[in-house]
Amino acid sequence: MEIDKFVKEEDIPFEYGVVRERDNAVSWSRYLATKRSAGDELNLDWLYERCLKEIKDDWHLWKEFLKWRIELLNDCDIFRHKDEYNKISLLFEQCLTSCGKVGDAWIMYMEWVIQFKDLKRIRELLGKALRSMSWEYHEAIWRVVIDFIINELLIDNKRYELSLEDSIYYFVHGEHSTNFDTDLWSSSILQRYSLICDDIEPLLIYIFKTHDWSTIVRVFEKHLSPNLKPSQTSLFELYVSYITSMILVDNSAGVAAVVDQCIELFPFKKGELKTYLIFNLIRQGKITEAELYLEKVISETKDIIEFSVLYDFWIRMEELLTQELIQKMKDDNSEKQRLFANIRLHADTLTSLIKNHTIRLNDLELRREPNNIKLWLERVKLFDTISDKAKVYADAVLTVDYRLQTTPGLLGELWCQYCRLFEEDIEKSEVLLDKATNVPFKFLVDLENVWLYWCEYRLKRSIDDAIKVLSVVLEIPDNHELLLQKFEKGESPAQAAIFSSKRLWAMYLDLLEVKGNYGTAVNAYETAILIKAATPAMFINYALLNESSGHQAEALAVFERSVEIFPPSVSKSIWDIYLDVALKADITKEQKRDIFESAIKLAASGVACVSFFEKYSDFELNLGFHERSVEILHKGAKNISDLESKCTLWEECINRSEKQLDVNHTRKLYEECIETLPNSKAIKFLLPFAILEESRNEVARCRALLDYGSKLLKPAQNEELWDFWRNFETMHGTKDSFKNMLKARRFLEDTMKVNTEEVSRHADSIEFRASTAKISGSGPPSAEDKGYSNTAEIDLGL
């Protein structure tokens, strides 16, 4: 008997137990544990089968038995031990007969079956399991199957992308791409799973890898929406997958609808999205429609990114079409003539696209900014022939809205360039100029540019023609002040104020002077002054015209009027010329002095009019009034506010005093200069002053000046003074004074670590005090003076 074969003497107690209570799982478990520890696999298998015949619905025993049987087959070849694998499958079937409601049993069976990769069996088992299991176990068994699909069936499948190269190849050769493996089994399982799936994103990603386009379209149509918030990919990529699938199932209407939806969702991607419409047309063999669509979109878009994407796509499409057609013609001569015509057509299109890229880009920019004149002027440069350029100019002047211009002069320049194009055609050029002068320009400079160009154009033929043009436009209307007010308020165009154009008046007056009619020129100048169109340059020219014509008094009168009209900062340039003319004029010395006195009043307004004081001083010097000459420079040094100009005049004043006046006068000037100038500027005058005192043998005063000057700058920055002082002490000093000089330098080198300019601003800083000593004349000093100057008179203020 079989029982005698497996039951040993030590098993008898267990046998009594299981015989008495056949349905007692505990007794069976103890018995099985004993057998398991014995290591007899046949005996254990026999005992498990006996046990499960008695207790058929105990899942824990079944699970224990099945796990043990499966472990026995670990590392065994599934094909060489196929019978053993089938036995386990039968055991699972027996288990499910009794434990069909146990979810874990179905899951364990599915994991076992998946090892065989028998897709039919997996699908059938999945169906049985879902029908038998309770609802809460459905997701678990689905997870097993889905993981199998992802990790085994779709592991090598890449995300399919439409290729322009493939699309053109199949278009030329008349067939559709089949360059992908369709996994119908996986797509059907995934589609079924989508009905209960909570996380739809990974399912959409993986079902797209099955390449079952019809199923993919159905699943995407049902589950993809703008509300989806993917984490593994982007919503845009999911929509691209959807569009790609519809293209591959030839659903043109669906493609167009979804692309339109995506353009609203992803406006920054509309260029790329529209390429899928072109892919769809190419797949349908409608290459001409694809080209027309590209032409339409590129000609209408205002989006630079969309333009770039589609333009590059079109160029690549034409390149591939040309290449594939050439290759087909090489392979098949039967349609050589038709293919050659197509090659020529696409090659011409490609050439045109490459050649006209800059022009088309300019088209786009002008669609975005039609009133941008700089773009129109750039566009003109893109064409070579006069007719093409003329068309651009014509389009520009018709398109540009003068009311929206913000840059003065550009619109006028556009019209001038337009007219310049037809300079050789006098009649046409004059017609264009007439039109240009009637444009209601917003800015005066635009209309000025047109009239100036017209004048210069006429001047090439005749000066009289040029004068005639300007005399018309500069005719003063009766209500000219009212017209100017309206223009300034923006109520009238530039034509209302053109008569007051300073640029036109300048040109007109220059032409009249060249013409040589003095009376006409004077009347024109007076008219310009009357309407306040005269500039400083016009006044100067008017005065010089009078001077050159022998009307000296009138010239000076014009100068006098002009300096009264313009503010000091502007009138300085007029005074420069006025003074030169006045000096040469046949008028009295007093009149010239009056003119100079008026000129130097500009100093009170903060104008650095150094040259006026210099000219005035030279004037008095030439007359022999030496002291007055110095006084004028002295006055300028005191009155001019600009520090550099002040220093210049002090230097000239002192130099002239040394040459023309006595030493007492010069000393007073030095003292006032040093006292009034900031220390940083005063130091420039200290050394010459010290040299002067040394020359007068004023040793103590010279030493005090050097001591004062040494404290204004760091010794390293004041070497010239220290060198002089060293030589001075060598020649005039004593041993003690020389030591004191060295001590002073060492002290200053150690302590002077701050900016002396800042120190000089404080109340306790170095202060210069002028001497009150009476010096006799300019002769040599007396013995009483030698070495006995009152040194207390120079207070160092330390």
UniProtKB/Swiss-Prot annotation:
UniProt GO BP: generation of catalytic spliceosome for first transesterification step
Major subcellular site: nucleus
Key words of the record: mRNA processing, mRNA splicing, Nucleus, Repeat, Spliceosome
InterPro entries: HAT (IPR003107), HAT_Syf1-like_N (IPR055433), HAT_Syf1_central (IPR056350), HAT_Syf1_CNRKL1_C (IPR055430), Syf1-like (IPR045075), TPR-like_helical_dom_sf (IPR011990)
Pfam family for this entry, one: HAT_Syf1_CNRKL1_N
SMART domains named among the record's database cross-references: HAT (SM00386)
Residues making up the signal peptide according to the UniProt record: none
Keyword Repeat: yes
Positions annotated as HAT repeat: 5-37, 39-71, 83-115, 117-151, 392-424, 428-460, 478-514, 516-548, 550-584, 587-622, 661-695, 697-731
GO cellular component: post-mRNA release spliceosomal complex; Prp19 complex; U2-type catalytic step 2 spliceosome
Subcellular location: Nucleus
Gene3D superfamilies per the UniProt record, alphabetical: Tetratricopeptide repeat domain (1.25.40.10)
Entry function: Involved in pre-mRNA splicing and cell cycle progression.
Family membership noted in the UniProt record: Belongs to the crooked-neck family.
Oligomer and partners: Associated with the spliceosome.
The protein's name: Pre-mRNA-splicing factor SYF1
Biological source species: Kluyveromyces lactis (strain ATCC 8585 / CBS 2359 / DSM 70799 / NBRC 1267 / NRRL Y-1140 / WM37) (Yeast)
